[in-house]
Amino acid sequence: MTTTTAVSPDRFKPCLRCPEEGPAVYVACLAAYNAGTLHGKWVDLSAVSKLVFTESGMATVLQQCIDLVLADSPEPGAEEWAIHDTQGLPKVLMGENPDLSELAAFTRQWELACEDSDDDAFRVWCDHIGEVQTYEDFREAYRGSWDSEADFVQDFYEQNGKDLGELSSYIDWEQVWYGEFSCDGWWSEYAGDGVYWVFSS
């Protein structure tokens, strides 16, 4: 990808770092790469988000951060760049030339998810859908974290007024998950540490 914008570095330098966690991209200068030199910097997307109020404004600031990386290149007049590494992004945004507006949109929605400690589940959900989604849409589909799909199904029946009494102990809830829920588009993701995230269709 090519860029030509000239920017003042001071405002955006705090964004040129890799955070301990959260979304970030490594911007590489292709002119330097093709000349046999590695030149690039991490861009902290959350730090970029803090500078502006809108997603479109964030995409503009992100482009200006990229311009700073190129301005500092050992190759004079460098214009082309690519993303050579990422952190905390869904796979759908892991290409060399992601849409900057999509990076901005994901970061803003991820920040909303962080407020409810749903950031990891939100990222997995975007991967499953295959595109960046809103946190509001995520909340409509997300059914929480469970020890197993079977535990979720049993609770689902109980919460919806289906009192099975003693029959509950004879039901294979795992088979109910696969035979009824999974076949109807519900899905789960193993989050580690014995926890499953469950999503509706």
Feature-to-residue mapping (PLM):
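N-terminal ordered "arm"
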Residues: 2-68
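Acidic, proline/glycine-rich low-complexity IDRs
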Residues: 4-12, 150-201
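Short, flexible beta-strand-to-coil junctions
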Residues: 28-34, 87-88, 190-194, 200-201
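Extracellular/secreted glycoprotein ectodomains characterized by long, lumenal stretches
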Residues: 96-99, 108, 120, 138, ...
